[in-house]
Amino acid sequence: FPLAFVLLAVLLANGELTFPWLKESGEHAHHHIPAWHNYTFLVVREVLGMIAVMVIHWIFIQRQAVSERSAEDAERFHNIACWVPYAYVLYGTMVAWDFEMTMLPSWHSAIYGMQHFISNFGMFLAFLVIWIYALNSRGKLVRPVEDYVYNYFAQMLFAFTLLWIYTFFAQYLTIWYGNLPSETVRVMAMQDGDYTFIWWSMLVLKFVVPFTLLSFPPVRHSVKATTAVATCIIIGTLFERYVWIGGVKGGVGTY
């Protein structure tokens, strides 16, 4: 969290370099800019949100350490654990809105927060698989992780692959069917513009490869195959984050 807070501070301090709409709002002050695009409000909510998440997770770790000491400690740990998913989803949604969706002030998607959360959580699972594999293969864990555990990881990766493509297609289909220029211009520009390679690579790495391979039990029971799929998911998610931010200017640009 300290590193995340420092990176957040750097992004917020960059102003127009991080949020291109700041320059446009200054040059065209007479144009309507949603209240959500108030820079002071943005900085305050992002900083307070990060602090709130840090505090909740700090309490979670402290109570987890003594959760087996007594029934009361177990209950206190359970209570704070119930708040962690809410904090993660709410703050994750705000990050999705501030750093991606609203980069183009006129563009909105009701499902974007959920799609962003599911995508990033899938990447977290993929990172966890690789991290455990790296530590386990080098004998760095106090208790080695058995190979059958990777099958459970593979099933979770498969589930979040399906959830991701569901939310992705739900958003894409709604925008395509509505056919409103203010909504379609951003998606079609990323799909057909200079970022088209990254766009289609994202779909291949985040859906085609995981869905195709993890559908077969031998792959799910293979440690190396599961780790390879996890690597594809991480790269695909990085492509996804890049194309949504970098492609905001009509899908035109170098990368």
Stretch-by-stretch model annotation:
Residues 225-235:
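Central hydrophobic cores of alpha-helical transmembrane segments
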Residues 34-202, 216-219:
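Long, contiguous internal "core" modules enriched in hydrophobic/ aromatic residues
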Residues 18-40:
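Interfacial loop/helix-cap signal at membrane boundaries in integral membrane proteins
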Residues 203-211:
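Core segments of transmembrane alpha-helices
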Residues 210, 239-250:
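Transmembrane alpha-helical segments of integral membrane proteins
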Residues 1-18:
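Membrane helical hairpin/interfacial module
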Residues 214, 219-220, 238, 245:
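Alpha-helical transmembrane segments of multi-pass membrane transporters
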Residues 184-191, 246-255:
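Short, membrane-exposed interhelical loops at transmembrane-helix boundaries
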